[in-house]
Amino acid sequence: MANIFEVPQPDNDLLEKAEKVRLASIKISQTENKNRIKALNFMADYLEKNSKEILEANNADYSSAEKKGISKALLSRLKLSRAKLNAGIEGVRKVGDLADPVNQVQIKKELSKGLILERKTVPIGVLGIIFESRPDAVMQISSLAIRSGNGVMLKGGSEANLTNTSIVKALQEGLNESGLDRNAICLLTSRKDSMAMLNLEKYINLIIPRGSNELVKFIQENTRIPVLGHADGICHLFIDIEANLEMALSVALDSKIQYPAACNAIETLLVHKDIAPAFLEKAIPLFNSNDVKLIGDNRSVELGLKYEASLQDWKTEYLDLILSIKIVNNVEEAITHIQKYSSKHTDGIITENSNTANKFMNVVDSSGVFHNCSTRFADGFRYGFGAEVGISTQTLPPRGPVGLEGLVTYKYFLKGGGHIVDDFSSGKAIYTHKDL
């Protein structure tokens, strides 16, 4: 991989910021649930009070990005409409309605009389988030961090610097008004600082990158800090021979055009050969009328597609109104294609045959496998998590959309009355190992 990024050592200014966030995170980790909820409400209040300033900053960012020729996908993510801002503010409040993820008892055992073991959830500490464009992500991530008792260091794309700065200022004012330390939320604005974050293992406990495949892989390979995230969103939808044709058309269209710049939008449509003629006869004009460029394999082109796909197309996350189509002989071939090219984000099947659906869902190794529904449902808010800090495609947990439950870890608490191991070794005491 070309070394387009460098990992500098953090300078004194960055170290000072990191130390402030670390100390603030310790305070917040000890803050009662009701006070963390109170902080979220104040954060939302200050976002509302500063909404005019935030939208003006976003208009300036958007205008500048347009002049620089930034891609349509990034421009779409950058734009913060009044409706999107209001939804983000409401999302901050709704995070407060979620169950407290901190101090939850997962295990409680009596090891011996008077010797009690508990496993309880605790905050991770300081989160380091690196993301592109989407300024609404600042609200989501910050609210989840505070709700789960964590501090957060944020680095958004430079194209959104004015918007992100305005949002973070409002969030910090809300924190301060609530009585919590405003330093729990910190925004970095330079590329150098975002890369130097990778050397802050003494301050940051988890890095969550949300950006290009190249950036995510670079971060995973160049830090000693644990990394949670996904590099690509190459999602597939398979139209089985026993699919309901109208359902297949509706779900395929929604999975692509509802928000093509999203990582849960499909990039490849796999179609069973025996339903392909009837499906494509309706799908081609439907997608064309929605400005979707269709490219496909030889069999798809023979059935009416204008553009032939290359090998690279099956590996590409378009994040745009472009869709690759491949005709397959059976569900096994569809699964083989997905296992080869999927980014393990979300893959779906449309079929009325429950056995085929179960086979597909059990074998495809993605964080989300869907039956007869749009891949666009792969989202923390739509799952009822309130919001998400990111999506993980790794096999170990957390996996899929990561909400509050993915921002806590656990700790073992053992309370006794002078118990010593030697008494158990000598037979003076016995283990009971009783669940409480």
UniProtKB/Swiss-Prot annotation:
CDD domains: ALDH_F18-19_ProA-GPR
Biochemical pathway: Amino-acid biosynthesis; L-proline biosynthesis; L-glutamate 5-semialdehyde from L-glutamate: step 2/2
A matching Pfam family: Aldedh
Main location: cytoplasm
Lineage top rank: taxon: Bacteria
NCBIfam families cross-referenced by the UniProt entry: PRK00197.1 (NF001221), proA (TIGR00407)
Family: Belongs to the gamma-glutamyl phosphate reductase family.
UniProt protein name: Gamma-glutamyl phosphate reductase
Organism name: Prochlorococcus marinus (strain MIT 9215)
Lineage: Bacteria, Bacillati, Cyanobacteriota, Cyanophyceae, Synechococcales
Gene giving rise to this polypeptide: proA
